[in-house]
């Protein structure tokens, strides 16, 4: 699926109403402040990933109009017209019908690499989890919903831990969610590793990617691992009043041989 035309109305500092895209590689050229990144942000928004920065900063700067519109024509397996309007609320449409961002991501899959993505190697595990979440949301439309459900359960677990409540029922409810998310992330990492292996010239050095289960990794089966790891960390979890096992603590281990990629790659190689 490729974008043939992108139309913008009242979007930041961009005055061009229609931007046409050709097949293959497209380059945006212009002076600093011309709106190159803003143009990419409009695509990022339209394709279901939200703004790159503050949502309140999207409307044209200095304009009295508070509503912003972005639409696009897409071609590939099918023809699709996507539209998003942002103001007091956000409305997303696919071929004229209201839809959700996960639906948009399944219609026109996309992945953006930004300067901040260097934190994929140097940053915290939360940054790498975010990358995995974006990748998995592209592969499985149901992923985002399952992730929201699990995060809600984690918040509930924190409350129960602080209150000294019974965790049995909640642990049972979280088990299939944790198992499913772990399985999805592991499959995504395996697919990414396979793709990188097929393109050896893409990277400066061979890298090995490993999905690391948060607070777990005792047994291979994700469901069994959930229960064994939960049992092993039960007392510590009670003491610190924080959930210690689950996808919310996952990481992506990136290595070059026996060394961390963050420590052995130069800044240029990391890019």
Regions found by a protein language model. Name each.
Residues 1-31, 63, 168-176, 180-271:
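Conserved NTPase motor "head" modules and their coupling/switch loops across ABC/AAA+ ATPases, GTPases
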Residues 119-205, 213-214:
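An accessory alpha-helical subdomain
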Residues 22-58, 128, 266-271:
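Phosphate-binding glycine-rich loops of NTP-binding sites
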Residues 47-127, 136-143, 191-201, 222-223, ...:
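Nucleotide-state sensing region of NTPase/ATPase domains
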Residues 10, 42, 114-116:
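A secondary-structure boundary/capping signal
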């Amino acid at each position: 699926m490729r974008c043939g035309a992108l139309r913008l109305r009242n979007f930041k500092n961009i005055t061009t109403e229609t931007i046409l895209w050709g097949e293959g590689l497209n380059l945006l050229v212009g002076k600093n402040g011309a709106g190159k990144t803003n143009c990419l942000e409009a695509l990022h928004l339209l394709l279901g990933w939200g703004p790159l920065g503050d949502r309140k900063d999207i409307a044209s700067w200095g304009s009295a109009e508070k509503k912003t519109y972005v639409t696009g024509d897409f071609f590939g397996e099918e023809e699709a017209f996507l539209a998003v309007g942002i103001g007091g609320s956000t409305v997303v449409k696919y071929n004229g019908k209201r839809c959700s961002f996960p639906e948009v991501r399944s219609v026109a899959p996309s992945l953006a690499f930004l300067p901040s993505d260097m934190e994929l190697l140097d940053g915290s595990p939360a940054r790498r989890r975010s990358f995995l979440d974006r990748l998995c949301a592209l592969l499985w439309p149901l992923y985002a919903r399952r992730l929201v459900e699990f995060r809600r359960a984690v918040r509930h677990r924190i409350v129960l831990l602080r209150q000294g409540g019974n965790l049995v029922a909640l642990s049972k409810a979280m088990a299939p969610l944790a198992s499913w998310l772990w399985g999805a992330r592991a499959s995504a990492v395996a697919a990414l590793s396979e793709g990188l292996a097929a393109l050896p010239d893409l990277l400066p050095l061979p890298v090995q990617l490993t999905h690391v289960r948060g607070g777990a990794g005792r047994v291979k089966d994700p469901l069994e691992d959930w229960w064994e790891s939960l049992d092993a960390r039960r007392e510590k979890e009670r003491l610190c009043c924080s959930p210690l096992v689950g996808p919310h603590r996952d990481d992506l281990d990136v290595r070059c041989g026996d060394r961390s990629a963050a420590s052995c790659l130069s800044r240029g190689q990391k890019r």
